[in-house]
From Swiss-Prot:
Gene3D superfamilies listed in its UniProt record: 3.30.70.860, YajQ-like, domain 2 (3.30.70.990)
Endpoints of the signal sequence: none
CDD domains: YajQ_like
Keyword Lipid metabolism in record: no
Protein family membership: Belongs to the YajQ family.
Described purpose of this protein according to its UniProt entry: Nucleotide-binding protein.
Descriptive protein name: Nucleotide-binding protein RALTA_A2535
Species of the source: Cupriavidus taiwanensis (strain DSM 17343 / BCRC 17206 / CCUG 44338 / CIP 107171 / LMG 19424 / R1) (Ralstonia taiwanensis (strain LMG 19424))
Amino acid sequence: MPSFDVVCEANMVEVKNAVEQANKEISTRFDFKGSDARVEHKENELTAFADDDFKLDQVKDVLISKMAKRNVDVRFLDYGKTEKISGDKVKQVITIKKGVTGDLSKKIVRMIKDSKIKVQASIQGDTVRVSGTKRDDLQNVIAMLRKDVSEAPLDFNNFRD
């Protein structure tokens, strides 16, 4: 019975490359001369540092542009609160979303059931497994989800026959 998984996870290699490119651009830009602006990457978390709120926004813009060039969807990023650290400097923690959330997975299962396509959808942790008897039905489900789900970047993997 053919099946596939609906997941929501960023390519961490591309995220790392985008952070390195952003840091390289920040270190060479004239408007960041003499400032301690940078982006740090630790597992599923990015931390943006800058001298003030304006420069922090500039750092985030550089990061977003580099991620877009590396084909990393910016909907993976979840921005935390801006915190003041020593003196006037500020930092912001940006978490990288991983996995399909509970509400989104329920919405996906409901959409699949309401579509009347002859497939079964089940929630398995942070993924949604879709299985059916025909490969064409599964491809129709993928097309429907790509069209209708816009709040999260979905990937489809583990396609089995």
